[in-house]
Amino acid sequence: MANTTLTLDIIGMTCAACSNRIEKKLNRMNHVQAKVNLTTEKATIDYESDDYHLEDFVEQIQSLGYDVAVEQVELNINGMTCAACSNRIEKVLNQTQGVQQATVNLTTEQALIKYYPSATNTEALIKRIQNIGYDAETKTSSKAQSNRKKQELKHKRNKLIISAILSLPLLLVMVVHISPISIPSILVNPWVQLILSTPVQFIIGWQFYVGAYKNLRNGSANMDVLVAVGTSAAYFYSIYEMMMWLTHQTHHPHLYFETSAILITLILLGKYLEARAKSQTTNALSELLNLQAKEARVIKENKEIMLPLDKVKVGDTLLIKPGEKIPVDGKVTKGDTSIDESMLTGESIPVEKSSGDSVIGSTMNKNGSIMIEATQVGGDTALSHIIKVVEDAQSSKAPIQRLADIISGYFVPIVVSIAVITFIIWIIFVHPGQFEPALVSAISVLVIACPCALGLATPTSIMVGTGRAAENGILFKGGQFVERAHYVDTIVLDKTGTITNGQPVVTDYVGDNDTLQLLASAENASEHPLADAIVTYAKDKGLNLLDNDTFKSIPGHGIKATIHQQQILVGNRKLMNDYNISISNKLNDQLNHYEHLGQTAMMIAVDNQINGIIAVADTVKNDAKQAIKELRNMNIDVVMLTGDNNRTAQTIAKQVGIEHVIAEVLPEEKAHQISLLQDKGKQVAMVGDGINDAPALVKADIGMAIGTGAEVAIEAADITILGGDLLLVPKAIKASKATIKNIRQNLFWAFGYNVAGIPIAACGLLAPWIAGAAMALSSVSVVMNALRLKKMKL
């Protein structure tokens, strides 16, 4: 057995006990010698390679509560022609030492690879791809990639034009066989046909030979193999016929030069149309990229300097004039203006900005000159994060693609086998001893089969669907979430900031100003949304705030503070009961009254004596009732989940049309409530702000983070709703359902085309050129069907 040495970067070690624990765990494995260095945070492992895989050691380390460093790289891949290619590359990468997971997308021509940096690197991964016959490079900027694809499209167009010019005369020869029209006799000359077809076969069509050779050399087969074998059979049979004619001069040869040339031309036409259609699938991403400013006006040494955007650094001072885009995320340091943030929030009304306010890159400055300090630049800006989410979603795979991937892996060998069987049956049984009909039928089988349509069926729909959703402010994190969302039958909505605006105001206060001063001073240390409303209310009354000696937040109950040796309690009935503070019937009636109105009522106790009541209300979003109505019309059960008291929650629920309410739930219990719904067989989506309900978002089958501007937690959820518009929640479900429906249509067409087309070709009912045209158009039709999603109404 061969010995192998492996080094892993470990995350989470804090002391020698950690490193010793990991070392002991690894050394308990048979035939393993491990040393863990706390200083370098690395584990060096010697083991017998036949006994273990890298993942075995990672699993052992993770079982102790530590992790192994993983990096991610995106590669552009050139040379893929069909699903067999992408599947081959993906399989090889996933079998590579050090790779955690790799996915290859035929539509975007990219690979997304997660790997252990101490076990492999980008250069090794690129070399691995090159060794199986494809070209790979580290992903360039989206703009550079767009320019490269434009050049590739132009190159494909030029090849198509040349091939068409050479093949057109041969097409006329083919027409003579099926119609009585006359053509110049020179075109029937075998030598002319040879001269016209040879450049098409071996210069224009050389790419098919190269692709076939590379795949066969590595023990696999793809579309190039089918095209190369099929067209070569027609071409070289024609050469054979010419040689027999020159030798015997007995009859005019039966030539198929036109078949090989026209097949190649039609396939090139299909590939060109496919590339053009695929370029349209990234329009949404292109539009996002176009939102970015190209340069910024930076103030240095009291001078204005125009710099490219990539030269701007955090801390730079920028001047933005009216009508200009905000170049980067920043904070206003001087001036007042209004900003159009509709590109991010969907809200058409400009937002007023003054000194100290945050601004978002790529939004539009409307009517005032301002100076800002850059806080986020380059890939860290809000728009860059959005673009990254869209790119990742468009490059990802949906689980529904697995069947197509499995079939594509065996597709070409099966088709070649069917072609051979077809040839044998025809030459032995159908037309015994006749070579031509057998050859023509076999060629038709080879060229009608299309693994491309199978490979494009899912990713093109995912690209267009997620792009269209992004245009509407809905960001899917990946194809798997597009698929998972269409199964959702229950949506759980957090109340504050989701159903309501999240900007509460004080509606009633019963008590004196001294109590209000103590109340506001205590709440000033709290981060709860209601606290801001109380502090603002007290300041508007002209009260000065006092310093807290101590402060404690009691989730689900309220707060406790000490101010000038006085104990202050602010909260609900539970809090008062915990401190044995009695609540009179009159006080309880007042609480019930406020709660019946949908307000949150809190009592203020000073030294265990209730001195006042304050009621705070949060207004319901204008679109909440309509959004919930749309969800219910889609047969989706809507649940409100809140920490607020049941009476207030029921009042808000009644306003918006929610029947199922789960109230008085502590933040840490929200995830448990999601589990209870899932235990009933529900497919649950949780909608919240992604911050204080993150565990519930993670626990749900689909987590949706909803928020405004740069504050929305994109990383916290599977789907991000920009702008805080609750109507985007049903739209997200609609986008998911429409995309999955489109994928199923594509898969049905791709499978059905091959299942029906191959037997028809084998029966000799299709001429090779018709079979080739059908093959070329099959993949185009799949892409065109996916493009229909660009017009879907959400």
Curated annotation (Swiss-Prot):
Signal peptide: none annotated. SUPFAM superfamilies: Calcium ATPase, transduction domain A, Calcium ATPase, transmembrane domain M, HAD-like, HMA, heavy metal-associated domain. Residues 4-69, 71-137 form the HMA domain. Mg(2+) binds at residues 689, 693. One of its GO terms (cellular component) is plasma membrane. It comes from the Bacteria. It is found in: Cell membrane. InterPro entries: ATPase_P-typ_cyto_dom_N, ATPase_P-typ_P_site, ATPase_P-typ_TM_dom_sf, ATPase_P-typ_transduc_dom_A_sf, HAD-like_sf, HAD_sf, Heavy-metal-associated_CS, HMA_Cu_ion-bd. Cu(+) 2 binds at residues 82, 85. It catalyses: Cu(+)(in) + ATP + H2O = Cu(+)(out) + ADP + phosphate + H(+). Gene3D superfamilies: 3.30.70.100, Calcium-transporting ATPase, cytoplasmic domain N, Calcium-transporting ATPase, cytoplasmic transduction domain A, HAD superfamily/HAD-like. Belongs to the cation transport ATPase (P-type) (TC 3.A.3) family. Type IB subfamily. Involved in copper export. PANTHER family: ATP7, ISOFORM B (PTHR43520), P-TYPE CU(+) TRANSPORTER (PTHR43520:SF8). This is Copper-exporting P-type ATPase. The lineage of its organism: Bacteria, Bacillati, Bacillota, Bacilli, Bacillales.
